[in-house]
Amino acid sequence: MLKSFSLIGKNITKNVSLSSSNKFLFGKNHQNMKSIYSSIRFFSSEQELPPRDSDQFDVVIVGAGPSGLSTAIRLKQLSEKAGKDLRVCVVEKGSEVGSHILSGAVMDPKALNELIPDWKEKGAPLITEVKQDKFYFLTENRSLRLPTPRLMHNEGNYIISLGNVVRWLGEQAESMGVEVYPSFAASEVLYHDNGAVRGIATNDMGIAKDGSLTSNFTRGMELNARLTIFAEGCRGSLTKGLFEKFNLRDECEPQTFGLGIKETWEIKPEKHQQGLVIHTLGYPLSDELLGGSFIYHAENNTVNLGLVVGLDYSNPYLNPYQEFQKLKLHPMVKDMLEGGTCIQYGARTINEGGFQSIPKLVFPGGALVGCTAGFVHVPKVKGSHYAMKTGILAAEAAFPQLISQQEKEQEQEQDKPSVEPLLINEYPEELKKSWVWKELREVRNYRPSLHWGTIPGLIYGALEMYIFRGHTPWTLSNGKPDNERLKPAAECKKIEYKKPDGQITFDLMTSVMRSGTNHEENQPIHLKVRDMEVAKKVNRDIYDGPEGRFCPAGVYEWVEGEKGEKELVRNSVFCLHCKTCDIKDPTQNIDFTVPEGGGGPKYGAM
């Protein structure tokens, strides 16, 4: 059931009231939201579902990550400067702002400097400035230090917890009047009769696993807006539908992804070097696998350790989680971790398609910002500053149209907002003039060149980086989508992994417990299998159940059923919302949909 609203860790309850038309008003200084939810509960699963209650905003933003919150903050800054008032709402499926955020992370403060120039004075949690970069090529037992590539230099950048930065951004947004609602999972895009986006709906709560309504059933809400900004992060569940409805990917290449698996450790003080940034290529990944590791020495003797595995791999027996365990047994890494304590674990997919995989960004009534659109600099292993910049640009493009429509309605004394869709074409136009576009275009050939192998890819990447600087007349292709890359199990060699030692390496369930993930068990499974027979005939019989290995949370298992054949079991309570299954399933037979709001991981300083 829904909980009262506790924003960004504070004991602040958002207040609402019912208008004469029985619609929600989220604003402050009204009666308690919880009492209104009580008024729309229903006590029998046999009752016909009523219409959703609704509310009207100027802008609704889906996702309280760096892109969504930057959009909200810039809109409020522009409103204040112009003496206007815009009602801006941010909905977040995590239990609090930041609870679903996982990143390395080393942050380039360029976009933050633009958004909030006095961020230091306001206490932004950018604490550890990078002091040294190191770059290694690893073999099974050795490490060869190489010159750090130009684009991987981190002078002036900060080792951060992106979750903590996002929590701080949420506080800044709220202080400016942005309405931020965690535990609200956007489950549906709403459309006007003319096909334009008119907002989103949150999912119903209190539906039992068998589909019946519990005594705590609560209808979802419609959040209508002049403009809806989708900032869902990598592989957004609503964004997938928008790609198809508005043909947003017709003129770009398929996106390609990586799976990032991360642990935070507290290590011995004598082994800690605050401000040190290490990136590696090579071991534990074989030459045909794309990816690499990162080791970031943050404050308080903590180290952020992670491995990114390209999801365009072909061997269905590959297990990214086990590859990460292998990394920790490398002498350079193991020596650092010995005597330390693993504090947190998590996983999340990352866009790696780059420049050639960026979709169309605007459509009637809406826009895409940040990682949901694929803005990640692969060589730099960074995306948060791009997320923030795209949010800033989207807000600046939208603001004049929002105010113009608002003023027009006031002149005509309209009671209801206009249904004329906003189309903020200025956003992609300004983006193409920005440093984001320039930088992504410059490195567009780096990721696809690695398909030639690690060493040839590094040589070509060096030529691109130092000689051509992105000015080559060609653009390399990312090739087939990741889900089409797997080879049949019969053509591949099984991979044997060592048992965990419980000190440096861990069994999967021990790690999952460190993520804090949790879901209401009595709810429909949110990982939908469209056709279970396809899963059996393709996933099980041809690829030997790859979802049991590519999932970094142990959600999927093939277990012997009553008829003696293996059946697919989904332990969705363990789900980390990483979206790997949605991406890598060979026939795109698995769909990630949002569970009840507030479910999923509860990442702390990840």
Swiss-Prot record:
Top enzyme class: oxidoreductase
Pfam families per the UniProt record, alphabetical: ETFQO_UQ-bd (PF21162), Fer4_ETF_QO (PF05187), NAD_binding_8 (PF13450)
Signal as UniProt keyword: no
Gene Ontology molecular function terms on file: 4 iron, 4 sulfur cluster binding; electron-transferring-flavoprotein dehydrogenase activity; metal ion binding
Cofactor descriptive note: Binds 1 [4Fe-4S] cluster.
Record-listed [4Fe-4S] cluster binding positions: C551, C575, C578, C581
Cofactor dependence: [4Fe-4S] cluster; FAD
Cited Gene3D superfamilies: 3.30.70.20, 3.30.9.90, FAD/NAD(P)-binding domain (3.50.50.60)
Protein family according to the UniProt entry: Belongs to the ETF-QO/FixC family.
Subunit structure: Monomer.
Name of this protein: Electron transfer flavoprotein-ubiquinone oxidoreductase, mitochondrial
Source species taxonomy: Eukaryota, Amoebozoa, Evosea, Eumycetozoa, Dictyostelia
